[in-house]
């Protein structure tokens, strides 16, 4: 029998979130709806999830000693990583000592860098991927580009939201791509992956939730990216029965290998009926924000249930829906979001503003959500709402 205590009391069920971005914020809210006490941790103060948690701490999560000290102080029932830049060796130690790391310390360690998960997928599980090379210096990088061929994709082995990622389309871009990769890694410069460019029909996120009753699949999510970062997503993505079956099989194989309970964002390329594995995140996925409009239980609510060992009997889709990221460019720590009466005037339209305190360059500050009778109309509705938004820096 699963039980939950009372927040801020000795019997509280406690979750410590490592990373407090907009995805973590929604997980915190869902956990609190279930009576869980939440501690939010990030490298900067007043991160989105910290704003809604019971307590917040600001540390470098790459500092294993600081991470251990915090775990020993709070003694959480669950440690839930939300970002890649974490001292995963410390998480492995804590798990061995009896702490419950979600989904597992192994999953967090393997997926924190692209090398671990690519070698698991391609070399151990035999999943189809793009051709790839891992390199540590400019000389080997140039050789890898020559072997893989142009065009090719370059990514730091540890980064997110497109940071440090680029596509080499001509030889004169090789040096620039290397330099950019060294600036964009979560842990600084260093090792990168060079991948062959896949000519796919479309790409999907196959959200997969491992829970006390087994493994369940959400309807596939289509999405569009710019510079490696999500801009729009929609659910469901139309695909053939065979392609969907293969996508779910691929997702089940990789998530089973990672183990544990929780939601996984499995990124796949689709070429006709063929499925090519790209990446997996052992946590909610940015493209999955659309589920806040499309499903009875969003990816965040499903993650919370899975973490706590609560049953997930059915994943019910309310409506086709779409999301559009609110990406702002500039420099400010005092943003204003205006014209909201116009943004929300159409039925089935909603907005989430993340509460981020500043922007310096490009930053995702919110998301538009829209429902309609099909995904094309939902996306058009989201785009109309987005066009009406006035952001003042």
Curated annotation (Swiss-Prot):
Its EC number is 6.3.1.21. Keywords: ATP-binding, Ligase, Magnesium, Metal-binding, Nucleotide-binding, Purine biosynthesis. It catalyses: N(1)-(5-phospho-beta-D-ribosyl)glycinamide + formate + ATP = N(2)-formyl-N(1)-(5-phospho-beta-D-ribosyl)glycinamide + ADP + phosphate + H(+). N(1)-(5-phospho-beta-D-ribosyl)glycinamide binds at residues 22-23, 82, 286, 356, 363-364. Transmembrane segments: none annotated. GO terms for molecular function: ATP binding; magnesium ion binding; phosphoribosylglycinamide formyltransferase 2 activity; phosphoribosylglycinamide formyltransferase activity. It comes from the Bacteria. Residues 119-308 form the ATP-grasp domain. GO terms for biological process: 'de novo' IMP biosynthetic process. Pfam families: ATP-grasp, PurT_C, RS_preATP-grasp-like. ATP binds at residues 114, 155, 160-165, 195-198, 203. Mg(2+) binds at residues 267, 279. GO terms for cellular component: cytosol. Pathway: Purine metabolism; IMP biosynthesis via de novo pathway; N(2)-formyl-N(1)-(5-phospho-D-ribosyl)glycinamide from N(1)-(5-phospho-D-ribosyl)glycinamide (formate route): step 1/1. It is an enzyme of class 6 (ligase). Belongs to the PurK/PurT family. Homodimer. Involved in the de novo purine biosynthesis. Catalyzes the transfer of formate to 5-phospho-ribosyl-glycinamide (GAR), producing 5-phospho-ribosyl-N-formylglycinamide (FGAR). Formate is provided by PurU via hydrolysis of 10-formyl-tetrahydrofolate. This is Formate-dependent phosphoribosylglycinamide formyltransferase.
